[in-house]
Amino acid sequence: MPITPIPILLPLPTAGLPILKSTDLVNWTLVNPAIKDVPPAEFYSAAPRHGKGVWAPCIRYHDGEYYIYWGDPDFGIYMVKASDPEGQWSEPVLVKAGKGLIDPTPLWDEDGKAYLANAWAASRAGFNSIVTISEMSADGTRVLGSPVIVFDGNDGINHTIEGPKLYRRGEYYYILAPAGGVVDGWQLALRSKNIYGPYEKKIVMAQGSAPFNGPHQGGWVTTAAGEDWFINFQDKAAYGRVLHLNPLRWVDGWPVIGEDADGDGCGQPVVKHRK
């Protein structure tokens, strides 16, 4: 008599946020995951959750610790931190609960105040194409007050702005964010002398004549040698999202990303570059 196996459902492993390290921004080594279970664990361990979970994490170093913020469009913005990125990370903290909160990036200012910029997912919030900034507690664990809209991409031009990365350079606050769509968009730079704006805007990288579509979401990195680089992705549909590394330089207070052959201040992705 044949024996029919009885299926047993076991909790699914949901470790996430893999940490990679590099000494040259080209070759990367996997270190460890920053979270053991994607929160809330009871939700994500029960079944596969396609299109949910950790969206667009942002890592920052502040006051001797590494912080990672990410948005979960169904639950809110989370944070973990560690003094050693290759060691043990803290348990996730829900910094801001809500629907549609995505792509967070923190900034600790020179006066000790902390801020959090983020975008919004229309699939959960009912709207998108805006960037908001909120003040945070100094320890980065909670948002203080209501978010302030600092840029509205519903202007018929910069729709689908998302993935903001917030920086302070000199007297200006900068937000680097892709707009125009994941596949066909461009990199937009916003700058203001006030954290809440108003912000000037400028396109600082587009596809141009390069064979790489829509240079999308990424971040600015300064090396120990003082070189500036921009890491961003290109959406290739079923092939996935391909990472690109482009040189970044500053001209008249604006970043120029990639190759700017005509000198108009808007670069395009490089096809090849010195390592």
Where are these regions (language model features)?
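Carbohydrate-active catalytic/glycan-binding domains of CAZyme proteins
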Residues: 1-275
